[in-house]
Amino acid sequence: MQKVRVHEIALELGIKSKEIIDKAKDLDLDLKTASSALPQEEAAELVNYILTGKSSRLKPAAPAAPMPKEEEISPAPQEESQMEPKEEPQKEVKESVKEAPESLPESPKEEAFEAEIPKESVKVTPKTLEQEPPKEELVSIEPSLESASETLSDSNPLPQEKTETKETIVATTLATQTDAEIQESEEKKETLAQATVQKRVGLRIVKKRSEEPAPKADRPSLEEARTPSRTAGLKTLQSLLGESDESEAALARKKKKEKKKPLPAPTKKNEQKIDLLGDRALETVSSFDDEQEEIVLFDLTIRDDINKEDEVAKKVDTDRIKVQRKTPFLDQGIRRVKRRKRRPQTVADKESISGTIEIPEEIRAYEFAEKTGKSIGEVIKVLFNLGLMITKNDFLDRDSIEILAEELELDVVIKNTSEALEYTSEEEEDEDEEGLEERPPVVTIMGHVDHGKTSLLDKIRNTKVAAGEAGGITQHIGAYTVEKDGKKISFIDTPGHEAFTEMRARGAEVTDIVIIVIAADDGVKQQTIEALNHAKAANVPIIIALNKVDKPDANPDKVKAEAADLGYSPLEWGGEYEFVHISAKTGEGIDHLLETILVQSELLELKANPEKAAKAVVIESSLEKGKGPVATVIVQSGTLKVGDSIVADTAYGRVRALIDDCGKNIQSIGPSEVAVVTGLSETPMAGAVLVSVENDSIAREYAEKRALYLRQKELSRSTKVSFDELSAMVAEGQLKSLPVIIKADTQGSLEAIRGSLEKLRNEEVKINIIHAGVGGITESDVVLAGASDNSVILGFNVRPTGSVKNRAKELGVEVKTYSIIYALLDDVRAVLGGMMSPVLEEENTGQAEVRETFTIAKVGTIAGCLVTDGSIQRGIKVRLIRNGVVVFTGNIASLKRFKDDAREVSKGYECGIMLEGFNDVQVGDVFETYKEVEKARKL
């Protein structure tokens, strides 16, 4: 049976565990501590006894029925004489402690005393007990008596003695009751009711139990009350208290204190002392009614009221917080939307909505709803029906806006909103013809990898850049300025590797003339075609340089034929493209190439205004130690000076230094000139437009606006999904992924690596790029990689420091560094291949022909075979082939040579074979054994 602990009962009733233990002793329940347990039935009986004072387990105190023995009470006069001096100073204490303790234990115990008193006195008892025992003669004795008995019970005294004392007092009370005392007891009943109510659930106890010193002072009175007979006891009490002036003074003080006693203020919100009985007369109230009151009158209503007050207070606090702390998050809440919906539409609004509405090209769904006067629900519903799932904060593209306008029957005009974010728009005004000056041409060298682009530029500049390139291939855009016949030419060298498509496209965009380098001994290759397409898309003049003509196997005519097939015919063949024969090794044709460039630039009439605010294009950017973010730029118009405030996409700052291609510090650069800029807040994206503005605050404002816009756009893109894309996204989540962190030396290289890695995927594996950045490998990168399972850090032209290596070793993170991009891609491709599930390939091990069959009862069919090829092994996989058709595929259950089990039988020997779960073997069948071999797949 489940048991209940004392502290649980105390918690339920709102009283102390100690009081419950005291009450349990009246029912002969042996409870010692708050952790003591008792069965549920006894617990229910105990709770009922505490609340009502009634119990079927309450036994009459048998030893207390006869009168006390003479020898037990004989010490009373002695104790009285010894302790009498202490009675006077304790009177005030007794009266102050009187109220609550006096009445708490009375009502339950009186039930027991009714059974103990002889029948002749029972006639008087009910009336008396209903109206409470306190009397005029017992004003100073009874509280002390109660305190003493409680103290004795706490210290485990003899229960016999306490019961006898109680009975003696009750008997004395019956004998001395007067009409005045009855009236006094009615006043006292109110105190009893209050004390009883205080013990209910949810009500606090106003006063504690009697203090410790009080019982000591009360002992003389207690012993005096123990007289040999009732008559003697009556005389003793009368002699002590009846004619005493002090007792009358104490009674007067007690009455005065009862009238003036204020209700103590509640210390907790859920506790309140209430006067349940008021000033009602109690003569007509029966004991049963009082007990009903005790059971029914809980303070639930008061607690409810308190809870309501708390809720109101909380609501007030919340409202105050909303007013005081106004944040953009609160503006996006439900309340704001509701207020907007309730706002009545003015006549002006209706007129504007009915006409043509200007809608920005980049607009969120809820903003579209506001501008068109439609609800956001209508907008989302239309797009939902068309298979596009969006939220109210998602951006709408041009197609979605047009569809919505058609579906909702609106006349809208889409305008380009990015003008507000375009810091370059102010610079793109019509240039004043008077301020224009001739500028040098910007020439981009493009072509296939290893066709000699950088070597050609080295020969023009008389440097050795190519020799310093890792693997002999260019992996960054390089910008240089050379002088020919007093005229400057700016060259941009682009990588030829397939991974650097973006760089080549960027180089073609900012250029005036493109030189396509083709090796005369190799011909037109994939990247050559791509470079030609980039140049054609940029609508710039193309000069084709046939390099390596000094080689013995060079065939320029073959290259011209291949170019003509692509639509690039040479001038001598009636085409429009200049083909120049050069050799980067010997210098042959270099001057002719430069002259061709200058002639072409004169035809283009390249001009710019150097007095305007500078506008440049970021060719490459990187993070350099000691300099911070740096960007290689080529100026398109105006003049960029040291100290100018600049902004490039989300990066901003002030030009701290300008470094030319020779490494010298310069003060300014004009149109078509190249330099490295330092002083930016972050590395700008390659291809970003850099402009100079009036001051730093304007630059900062442009950059922050654009950063916020791009972030919102990215978040919006991540939430939008169509039904068709949904299944693809689910499948994407089930792919195995290799988490990588990429760190590169320049922004262009980073883009190239990122783009190449994202292409390395199939239906089973993919690359998950956790983080990609420009700069060295740091400890934070290692910690980030450590937080992801099986993450790898890939460094390109960067190296980790000693502390970073140690940290990576601690966290078990693999750091790989490369200087050649195709080595990086090959390694990643190999890792992805290992992640893919292996391919199972079959390898034939042997063949046997059935010559005879034997059927054995309870065993099966055994085939007598001759091994014709390889060897037959026990337990290996086997196919049964009959007339060229596979009849059964399974395992060999038993392999025997004559009567002995064999592990393997080689070619030319006979053996007996039994198949696992197949007996339909016929003469002439062929057994073909094989094993499955796992082989790693390649991406």
UniProtKB/Swiss-Prot annotation:
Residues 447-454 are annotated as: G1. The keyword ATP-binding does not apply. Pfam families: EF-G_D2, GTP_EFTU, GTP_EFTU_D2, IF-2, IF2_N. Residues 472-476 are annotated as: G2. Residues 83-122, 129-138, 208-227 have a biased composition (Basic and acidic residues). Residues 146-158, 170-180 have a biased composition (Polar residues). It comes from the Bacteria. Residues 252-262 have a biased composition (Basic residues). Residues 583-585 are annotated as: G5. GTP binds at residues 447-454, 493-497, 547-550. Residues 493-496 are annotated as: G3. Residues 547-550 are annotated as: G4. It is found in: Cytoplasm. One of its GO terms (cellular component) is cytosol. Residues 57-274 are annotated as: Disordered. One of its GO terms (molecular function) is translation initiation factor activity. Residues 438-607 form the tr-type G domain. Belongs to the TRAFAC class translation factor GTPase superfamily. Classic translation factor GTPase family. IF-2 subfamily. One of the essential components for the initiation of protein synthesis. Protects formylmethionyl-tRNA from spontaneous hydrolysis and promotes its binding to the 30S ribosomal subunits. Also involved in the hydrolysis of GTP during the formation of the 70S ribosomal complex. NCBIfam families: IF-2, small_GTP. HAMAP family: IF_2_B (MF_00100_B). This is Translation initiation factor IF-2. It comes from Wolinella succinogenes (strain ATCC 29543 / DSM 1740 / CCUG 13145 / JCM 31913 / LMG 7466 / NCTC 11488 / FDC 602W) (Vibrio succinogenes). The lineage of its organism: Bacteria, Pseudomonadati, Campylobacterota, Epsilonproteobacteria, Campylobacterales. The gene is infB.
